[in-house]
Curated annotation (Swiss-Prot):
GO BP field: establishment of competence for transformation
Inducing or repressing factors: Part of the comF operon, encoding comFA, comFB and comFC, transcribed in competence media (minimal salts plus glucose) once stationary phase is reached.
InterPro entries: ComFB
Membrane is among the record's keywords: no
Highest rank taxon of the organism: Bacteria
Function, in words: Involved in transformation (genetic competence for DNA uptake).
Protein name: Competence protein ComFB
Residue stretches spanning the membrane: none
UniProt note: phenotype after gene disruption: 10-fold decrease in transformation efficiency.
Keywords carried by this UniProt record: Competence
Species annotation: Bacillus subtilis (strain 168)
Length: 98
């Protein structure tokens, strides 16, 4: 089984720093959009076993790499907040109310 370890790490970072990203909406659609945008900006890091993800996580001890990934998440969160998908739950609820 091939796994993109960066996807798992980015998801964990998104979950950990969700409150600090100040997203307009935190529905699953918007979270997935942020992850997709972020992952398209980083090089994939494939592993063949979930146990090997620890190496990618260990890279985050390097504050510069950790900060770089957080900046990518913050930029992606800003883009999604500015222009949410039509599938965004908050956007759909607002359209229903109006």
């Amino acid at each position: 089984m091939l796994v993109n370890s960066k996807e798992i790490v980015m998801k964990e970072l998104l979950d950990r720093y969700m409150d600090q990203l100040h997203m307009a909406c935190t529905c699953q659609v918007c979270q997935n959009d942020v992850l997709a945008l972020s992952l398209n900006k980083v090089s994939p890091s494939y592993v063949t076993d979930f146990k090997k993800i620890a190496y990618t996580k260990a890279e985050l001890v390097d504050k510069q790499k950790n900060t770089a990934m957080l900046v990518i998440l913050a930029e992606s969160a800003a883009v999604v907040s500015e222009s949410p998908s039509d599938l965004c739950q908050t956007k759909q609820e607002e359209a229903f109310i109006n």
